[in-house]
């Protein structure tokens, strides 16, 4: 203890930082302090021993002994005792809600009985615990009951007049406060220890429900007279049960007063938890309440913090010391328990409405697909392409208010083919029907203009395979209306500096999920996007009629061909060079012209771009091929709409091929489709158009089906490709009805 015996100079031996004063007494002052090692706030009762006489000194050490003895969740905990030559420091648990007297004074007519019952039951529970240990408080009053708002508890404090008693043996010391003291103490007679606390409990309950003390007159003499005569008036608003309990406790004759057992079993106190504190272990009354892992973790932190070695810590705990070692241990332990309790409360209090609010805030930029939604999808996702489920979105209630149309009618699920292993069998277009309107949709923007067009009848489409990827963090300022909905690949955690990686290592593809979307749902998405617009360079009046006609021909044959163009990460922004030539490349690079096929603009840098299209009339940036656009390639018969499935599955083929060390995405010797231009591995762009007849129409169906199945069996690698999907020249199958509806996926 030699290290602790320093004078008071704002700090206690460097162990506590003292702050403002919380209260003062005759011989003591209570200060707010911070435990230096743990950072926890505590209350420090500083007692000046030079002002104490022999009797007061005896009471002081009696208080310390009693507080060491009583360790209860409804009693303020004593952490440490620091004794110096002139002062005694008691390190106590800090209450955050003030005392009960101030709380009662804020309610002139008292608390409602339900709340009063809750607090009074906790006080009775604490006093009952003390009496079982043969400790009498002798100074029960609202000023010595402290609120702990974060824990929802009240706790007893100030055991300065407490003492040990033996059952059947009376005490003689007169102590306490006049307005709350029992008549026998004021008379100076011998008294039964538990009975004086029962009287004080009656006064506290009266104040809780009435808002004022039962015995309070103009002066102490009149107050003493009222106490001796036991005269008080209970307001008529107090219930009969509460009135009866008060009367049972405020009895002039101690032998007629109710015992603690009778109080606890009184009808008015039934139906209330006597101590909610028993549900938690804060404050921790024993180190044995901790798990072995938590116990060892705390000891390890103390050893590393040079508080003491392991043997000294264990010895201090086992001998129930009240020194800095045990104080540090219990403060650390209570922090762990408090954090655990807060997590449990947050988990229980997480309501669906709160989850919805968080979901809406993140809607415009990041669209998460909870794992629970897999049952609502018409295709079983690949085992390696899952999305981790967030606890905030674990419930089905997350979807309420955000989805109103479905991907698949549950009644139609039985019509889907069985999936065996990782392979996905080809689903014929006729096997899927438009989604039912009552089913919830996976992605839907809640906007009024979208709701107005939901009554449009969907047109049957072929089955489409959709790859979704979360958006890059660099695109978080994208407006809601321009947020991608379908046929897109999103990436989570993508940053701009990832594109500076080696060309053989494209940016990391974090998570992919393959699902089959309902044709009706797809059609509705594109129809709504027509009304929203996407900042296009094509007016909606130019193509609206043709687009409507193309939607009516969706079930007819469509010409599809597949062309692949290399696109480097250094590619410039749209319209950076050329006369409205759209997306361009620096001189010498493989530029790609994004003008429409019919109005080919200056592609990239013109003569410098090895991959650019021949220059022609200047076109607008990001132009789409309209139905009336002319084409240099003759149109002819093409594969059915089901070939659209194959086109998107080629994306998986490219992903799978990234696993191999070959230089090319597709082996030139084994390419099945002559329309697939073999390029070196890099970031890729896919265009679906109908420039002319494709030899894919003559492919062997068996080989084609085998190719599809093999594509879906290829595992996805940790790399990515960039896919740009453009609609066909005549059909507009992948686009909205508005002219500038290219689905740019970067």
From Swiss-Prot:
Biased composition regions of type Acidic residues, renumbered to the chain: 494-503
Ways its activity is controlled: Activated by phosphorylation on Thr-173.
Coiled coil: none
Positions annotated as active site in the UniProt record: 139 (proton acceptor)
Ranges where the record places region Disordered: 383-414, 494-638
Compositional bias segments (type: Gly residues): 575-592, 600-614
Compositional bias of kind Basic residues: 522-532
Residues annotated with Phosphoserine modification: 162, 362, 390, 482, 495, 518
EC number: 2.7.11.1
Protein kinase domain segment(s): 16-269
Cofactor needs: Mg(2+)
Residues the entry annotates as binding ATP: 22-30, 45
Primary residence: nucleus
Tissue: Ubiquitously expressed in all tissues examined with highest levels in the brain and testis. Strongly expressed in the pyramidal and granule neurons of the hippocampus and also in the cerebellum.
BP GO annotations: protein phosphorylation; regulation of neuron apoptotic process
An annotated GO cellular component: nucleus
Feature: compositional bias, Basic and acidic residues: 549-558
SUPFAM superfamilies: Protein kinase-like (PK-like)
Family label: Belongs to the protein kinase superfamily. CAMK Ser/Thr protein kinase family.
PANTHER family, sorted: MAP/MICROTUBULE AFFINITY-REGULATING KINASE, SNF RELATED KINASE
Purpose: May play a role in hematopoietic cell proliferation or differentiation. Potential mediator of neuronal apoptosis.
Protein name: SNF-related serine/threonine-protein kinase
Organism: Rattus norvegicus
Gene for this chain: Snrk
């Amino acid at each position: 203890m030699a290290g602790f015996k320093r004078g008071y100079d704002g700090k206690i031996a460097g162990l506590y930082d003292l702050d403002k004063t919380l209260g003062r007494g005759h011989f003591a002052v209570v200060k707010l302090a911070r435990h230096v090692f743990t950072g926890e706030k505590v209350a420090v009762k500083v007692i000046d021993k030079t002002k104490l006489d022999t009797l007061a000194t005896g009471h002081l050490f009696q208080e310390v002994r009693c507080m060491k003895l009583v360790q209860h969740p409804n009693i303020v905990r004593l952490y440490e005792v620091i004794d110096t030559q002139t002062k005694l420091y008691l390190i106590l648990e800090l209450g955050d809600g003030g005392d009960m007297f101030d709380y009662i004074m804020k309610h002139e007519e008292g608390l409602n009985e339900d709340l009063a019952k809750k607090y009074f039951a906790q006080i009775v529970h604490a006093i009952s615990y003390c009496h079982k240990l043969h400790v009498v408080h002798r100074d029960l009053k609202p000023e010595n009951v402290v609120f702990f708002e974060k824990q929802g508890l009240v706790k007893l404090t100030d055991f300065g007049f407490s003492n040990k008693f033996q059952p059947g043996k009376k005490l003689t010391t007169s102590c306490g406060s006049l307005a709350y003291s029992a008549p026998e103490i004021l008379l100076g007679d011998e008294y039964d220890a538990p009975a004086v606390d029962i009287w004080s409990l009656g006064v506290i309950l009266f104040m809780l429900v009435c808002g004022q003390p039962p015995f309070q007159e103009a002066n102490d003499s009149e107050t003493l007279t009222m106490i001796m005569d036991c005269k008080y008036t209970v307001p008529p608003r107090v219930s009969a049960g509460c009135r009866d309990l008060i009367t049972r406790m405020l009895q002039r004759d101690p032998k007629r007063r109710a015992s603690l057992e009778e109080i606890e079993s009184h009808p008015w106190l039934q139906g209330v938890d006597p101590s909610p504190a028993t549900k938690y272990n804060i404050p921790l009354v024993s180190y044995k309440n901790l798990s072995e892992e938590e116990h060892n973790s705390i000891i390890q932190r103390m050893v590393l913090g040079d508080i003491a070695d392991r043997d000294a810590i264990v010895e201090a705990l086992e001998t129930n010391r009240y020194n800095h070692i045990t104080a540090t241990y219990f403060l650390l332990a209570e922090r762990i328990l408090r954090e655990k309790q807060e997590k449990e409360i947050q988990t229980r209090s997480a309501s669906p409405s709160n989850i919805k609010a968080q979901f809406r805030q993140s809607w415009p930029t990041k669209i998460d697909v909870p794992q629970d939604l897999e049952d609502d999808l018409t295709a079983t996702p690949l085992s390696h392409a899952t999305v981790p489920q967030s606890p905030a979105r674990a419930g089905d209630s997350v979807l309420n208010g955000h989805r109103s149309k479905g991907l698949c009618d549950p009644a139609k699920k039985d019509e889907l083919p069985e999936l065996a292993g990782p392979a996905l069998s080809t689903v014929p277009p006729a096997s899927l029907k438009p989604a039912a309107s009552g089913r919830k949709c996976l992605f839907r923007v809640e906007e009024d203009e979208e709701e107005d067009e939901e009554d449009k009848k969907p047109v049957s489409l072929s089955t489409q395979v959709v790859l979704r990827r979360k958006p890059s963090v660099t695109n978080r300022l994208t407006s809601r209306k321009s947020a991608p909905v379908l046929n897109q690949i999103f990436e989570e955690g993508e940053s701009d500096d990832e594109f500076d990686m080696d060309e053989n290592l494209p940016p990391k593809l974090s998570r992919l999920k393959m699902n089959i979307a309902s044709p009706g749902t797809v059609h509705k998405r594109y129809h709504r996007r027509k009304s929203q617009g996407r900042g296009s360079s094509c007016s909606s009046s130019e193509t609206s009629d043709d687009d409507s006609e193309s939607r009516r021909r969706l079930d007819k044959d469509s010409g599809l061909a597949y062309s692949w163009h290399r696109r480097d990460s250094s590619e410039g922004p749209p319209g950076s060079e050329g006369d409205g030539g759209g997306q361009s490349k620096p001189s010498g690079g493989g530029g790609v012209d994004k003008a429409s096929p019919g109005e080919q603009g200056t592609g990239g840098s013109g003569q410098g771009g090895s991959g650019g299209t021949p220059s022609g009339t200047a076109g607008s940036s990001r132009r789409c091929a309209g139905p009336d656009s002319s084409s240099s390639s003759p149109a002819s018969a093409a594969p059915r709409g089901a070939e659209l499935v194959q086109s998107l599955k080629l994306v998986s083929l490219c992903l799978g091929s990234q696993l191999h060390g070959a230089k090319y995405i597709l082996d030139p010797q084994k390419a099945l489709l002559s329309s697939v231009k073999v390029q070196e591995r890099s970031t890729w762009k896919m265009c679906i158009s109908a420039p002319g007849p494709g030899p894919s129409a003559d492919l062997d169906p068996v080989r084609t089906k085998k190719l599809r199945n093999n594509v879906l069996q290829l595992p996805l690698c940790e790399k990515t490709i960039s896919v740009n999907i453009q609609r066909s020249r005549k059909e507009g199958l992948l686009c909205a009805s508005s002219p500038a509806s290219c689905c740019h996926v970067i």
